[in-house]
Regions:
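NAD(P)+-binding Rossmann beta1-loop-alpha1 motif at the extreme N-terminus of oxidoreductases
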Residues: 13, 35, 279
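C-terminal end-of-chain micro-motif
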Residues: 1, 279-281
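Mg2+-dependent prenyl diphosphate-binding active-site environment of isoprenoid biosynthetic enzymes
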Residues: 22-272
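N-terminal amphipathic/basic leader segments beginning at the initiator methionine
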Residues: 1-19
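C-terminal accessory extensions/subdomains outside the catalytic/core fold
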Residues: 272-279
Length: 281
């Protein structure tokens, strides 16, 4: 999934206000630190891949949606790492925002990124509505984080909200940016989110912290269920393979259907720790 330059340019443009002399300097630094340098930018690249697979792309709408979703993702990472949730000391191979700038600025930076996400799609109300749907309650990323505050949780509902929601926003907004009906693309996004969550659960148990760019063993440390604790290690790897096979079948008819399926499977498999590639092939 190529196209990093347009995404980075759009993200920089979304944070242009932080360059103003009126913006508190430490806050401005925290905002940029939260977004740059980024991770793999998987979500915005997925949105763009879906749009390009569909064909008749509105480039401006596509980039706006991709930017908005990545800003929301970055905001969710900043908040997820806070001591009141995971208390993760580092992210993307560097100290977490709250470690580098303090909890107060981390909260404010995450909040500001959410606001900027919706500002990015202001000219595209249909995309804004999709992003809003999957960011809020009861099924969005906020609900996913809120499940961690409950005495008990349903693993499927928890993972669909925390991970699947934003991937559904990606596939639906990507289709919309190509002037297609977004509804048939919702299920695909949820399934991709499921695959990524299973892969992340496997990495959390078996991955190397340095390779992942974030601490491992977080679910066990916080008493949260995951696919490995539920199905066992081998069972989780097998489950991932079954999800990947269903993903390819779930892609709606579009001109670039075959290539899109290959891209999704390749990117998801790449998340499995290197030493497990043979077992997950």
């Amino acid at each position: 999934m190529d196209g990093e330059n347009p995404i980075e340019k759009a993200l920089a443009g979304a944070l242009i206000g932080a360059n103003s002399p009126d913006c508190p300097p430490k806050f401005a630094q925290a905002l940029h630190y939260s977004v740059f340098p980024g991770g793999a930018r998987i979500r915005p690249k997925l949105l763009m891949a879906v749009a390009n697979a569909c064909g008749d792309v509105d480039p401006s709408a596509m980039i706006a949606g991709a930017c908005a979703i990545e800003l929301l993702h970055c905001a969710s990472l900043v908040h997820d790492d806070l001591p009141c949730f995971d208390g993760a000391a580092y992210r993307r191979g560097k100290p977490s925002v709250h470690v580098a700038f303090g909890e107060r600025l981390a909260v404010l930076a995450g909040d500001a990124l959410i606001v900027e996400a919706f500002a990015a799609t202001a000219a595209y109300p249909q995309i804004t509505r999709i992003v809003a749907k999957w960011a809020s309650a009861p099924h969005g990323i906020c609900a996913g984080q809120a499940w961690e505050c409950e005495d008990s949780l349903n693993l499927v509902n928890y993972q669909r909200a925390k991970t699947g929601a934003l991937f559904a926003a990606c596939t639906m907004a990507g289709a919309l940016a190509a002037r297609c009906d977004p509804k048939p693309w919702q299920n695909l996004g949820m399934m991709i989110g499921e695959a990524f969550q299973v892969a992340d659960d496997i990495r959390d148990v078996a991955g190397i912290s340095g390779e992942m760019g974030k601490p491992t063993g977080q679910d066990a440390a916080h008493g949260l269920p995951n696919m490995v604790s539920t199905f066992g290690y081998d069972g989780a790897v097998q489950y991932l393979e079954s999800v990947l096979s269903r993903i390819v079948e779930a892609i709606p008819e579009c001109p670039g259907r075959q290539e899109l399926g290959q891209q999704i499977v390749a990117v998801t498999r790449a998340m499995v720790p290197k030493q497990l590639h043979r077992g997950a092939a």
